Amino acid sequence: MNRELAEIGKKTRIDSIKEVSLDFYKDERGDLTVAEEHSLPIKIARIFTVRAQQESNRANHAHKECSQLIFCVSGELVVVCDDSFKKSTLILNNPSDGILVPPGIWLEQTYKKNNSIRIDIPRRPGKML
């Protein structure tokens, strides 16, 4: 982790990561997760997906000025969060449950199942550290 991130981390702590739950519906046909503008804690600037193989590591960066929502819509994702004072490990494996990560939190993500898919919804395009 670099010095600039450590400075940002003085203001942003792991404890400020928030759990986010989307509406979820299940019946005999399958599952449906719904994300609408009013149900998201941030305004959407862009959406991107990442699919990776088992034990692939991604992210390994922090956003300097941008909050982001992270969901694992298929498979399982282990997210290690680091604010330069404390580390926390979170497991995402339900498409309706995600996390809102504030700027300055270093993220390392490991895909625990083949073809796991992550959706990221950043508040705005941001600079990575």
Task: Report residues per predicted region.
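Short beta-strand-centered segments at strand-helix junctions
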Residues: 101-104
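Non-catalytic, conserved peripheral segments adjacent to functional cores
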Residues: 1-99, 114-129
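Beta-rich strand-turn-strand
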Residues: 106-113
